């Protein structure tokens, strides 16, 4: 009887300290289900991930200049089945107002940080919600300056796009 009670008690305590199964960590590998848009992906586990600290032009609802191209690039970088690791940015919230996990997405095969790569090629701009700059803030800002100077991606396709990392990217209405 005592042994049974001890096992039940230990099992109950383990449940209190074990991490929740739905909380992705950078040590766990996940598989991409599909790309929803340029800065949002869905995992086969059912989790929705918003790429943290970046913003891409909108594709749906109010389509913006370069939105489709940014989304297509993310789809090429993260085709269905791609193995990724997710890293939380301590400077930001863990989840956005839509219930998406805010994470850096890193491909397992080559270590490519997709958030950084999208900014590097001009498909995204830094977005520091509430002014909270994370671990890659300086790198993202430097890559944006370079992409703008070289007219890469949205910076070449959408002339006059303002750059304000505290407000996100707004390329304006999609031009025909």
Role assignments for model-derived ranges:
Residues 2-8, 13-176:
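Small beta-barrel nucleic-acid-binding modules, primarily SNase/OB-fold domains
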């Amino acid at each position: 009887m005592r042994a049974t009670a001890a096992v039940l008690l230990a099992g109950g305590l383990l449940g209190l300290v074990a991490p929740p199964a739905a909380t992705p960590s950078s040590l766990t590998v996940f598989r991409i289900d599909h790309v929803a848009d340029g800065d949002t992906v869905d995992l086969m586990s059912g989790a929705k991930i918003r790429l943290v600290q970046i913003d891409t032009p909108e594709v749906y609802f109010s389509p913006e200049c370069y939105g489709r191209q940014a989304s297509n690039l993310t789809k090429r970088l993260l085709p269905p089945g791609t193995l990724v690791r997710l890293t939380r940015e301590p400077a930001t919230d863990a989840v956005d107002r839509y219930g998406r996990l805010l994470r850096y997405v890193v491909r397992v095969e080559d270590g490519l940080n997709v958030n950084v790569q999208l900014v590097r090629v001009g498909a995204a701009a830094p977005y520091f919600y509430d002014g909270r700059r994370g671990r890659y803030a300086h790198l993202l800002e430097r890559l944006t300056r370079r992409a703008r100077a070289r007219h890469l991606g949205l910076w070449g396709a959408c002339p006059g796009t303002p750059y304000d990392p505290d407000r996100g990217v707004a390329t304006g209405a999609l031009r025909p």
